[in-house]
Amino acid sequence: MTVSTASGSGAGDKPGSAARTGPDGPAHTVDFEAAQTPRGLGPRGESRAGAWGLTALLVSLYVINYADKAVLGIIAQPLREELGLSSSQIGLVGSLFFLTFTIGGFFAGLLNRWMTLRWSLVLLALCWAAAMLPMVVVASFAVLVLSRLFLGLAEGPSSALLHTAAYSWHPPARRALPGALLAGAASISKIAIAPLLAVITVSFGWRWALIALAAGGLIWCVIWLSTWRNGPYIASGKTTASADAEPATPWISIFRSRTFVTGALVVMSVYALVSVVLTWLPSYSEEGLGYSRLQSGSMFAFPSIVGLLLMVLSSITSDRMISKGATSRMLRIVVPSVGVLVSGVLLFLLPSVGTPIVAVAILSIGYGFAATVFPLFNAAVAEICPPRQTAGTLGVFLAIMAIGGLVAPYATGVIVDAAATPAEGYATAFQVLGIVAAVCAVLALVFADPERDRARLRPQAPAVEGATS
C-alpha cells in the first residue's frame, strides 16, 4: 500500500486512494489498489519470501564481517603472549583498523557506481579472506598492523552496500526490521561465531581461527554468485526509471541536515562502545573480572543477546507503527536516543560495581539499549535522501560512525595501562564512553527530525511505499 507524506489536500491523491487524517490534519494518502496485492507479494510484485531469503544471505556476510573484526579481541591475549605486546599496542591495532575502515566507507558510493552489487560485495569478501592469511604465514606486530589496515579498508564500504542491497528488497516504510537484522549480525557473530573461534583458538591455536574465517568468506562468495539478484526498490549501478524520476539532492545539503549531523554523532559515540567491546571485552573479562580464557571468549554472547533482542523488537515495533501513521521522528529518533541515555547511565555506574556477574549484566544491558540506534538511525538517514543517493549517503554516514572505532580502542588501551588495576582501567573507559554517548543522544533528541528534513531536501519525493491502513 502506498502512503503519501504530502500535507494538505490533493498532494499525491489519485484514483483508488483515500485521505487519512493525522494529528495535524490530512497527512497520509492510502492507496487501496496497492492494498490488493496478492498474498506473498510486495507492493511491486516481488516475492516476500525471496526478499527475506536474500536478506538472510546479506546478513550472513555481515556475520562474517563482524567475526573478522571480533577475532582480534579473541586472540588478543595469545598474541600478546607470543609477540610480547602491551595493552596500548593491542589497542593501537584495533584503532588502526578503524582508520582505514573510516576511509573505506567513503568509497561505498563510488563502488556502487563502478560495479554492480553482485561483484562489489564479492570483491570485498575476497579481500577480507585474503587479509586473514598474512598473520598465519608470518606472525609479527608489523604484519598484524598491515593486515588489519588492509582488512579495515576492504570492510569500510561494506555496511552501506549491504544496507543498499537489503533496502532494494524492502519498501521504505518497512526497512527498520531488515536494518535491524543487518545490525544484529554483530550480535549473531558474537553469539554463534565468537565462542566457536574461542574454542578453535584454545584447542588448535589462534592461526586456525584466522584460517576458518578465510574459508567462511570463500564459501559465502560461491553461494552469493549463484543466488543474488537486485530488488525493485533502490537503484544500484544502472539506475532505474523510478529512481531517475526524483531529482538528485545536493550532497552538501544532505550532509548538513540536522538529522544527518546529530545522527552521525550518536552512531559514532555508540560505535565507539561497540569497537571497545569487540577489541577489549575478552581481555576485560579475563584480566578485569577473573574469568577463564575460554569463558572470556564466550562473553561476547551476553551483550550481543540483549542487543539483538532489543534491536529486533524496536525495529518491528517501529515498522508497524510507522505503517499506521506514527511519526518517523518519534520511532526512529526519540526511542533509540532514549535507549542511549539509559545506556549512558548504566555505564556511568560501572566503576562502582565490584561483583563480576553484575558488571557483565550492566555492560550487557547498556550495550543492548545503545545498539538500537543502528537500524533505526540508518533508516531515518535513508529517508532524507533520494534512492539513487542512498549508498553514497549511508557510506559517508557510516564512515563518520567508524571514527568512534578509530579513537576508542587505543584510548581504552592507554587508560588500562595507566590505571592501578586492569579492572579499574576497563571500567573507567566504559564510563567515559557512556557519558559521551548520552551527550550525543541529547543533541539528537533536540535537533534530529527526518520528516522535516525529507520535506526540505526531497520536495518531489514520491509516496512512501509499504504502509498499511
Could you say what each language-model-derived stretch is?
Residues 103-139:
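Conserved MFS/SLC helix-loop-helix module at the cytosolic interface between two early adjacent transmembrane helices
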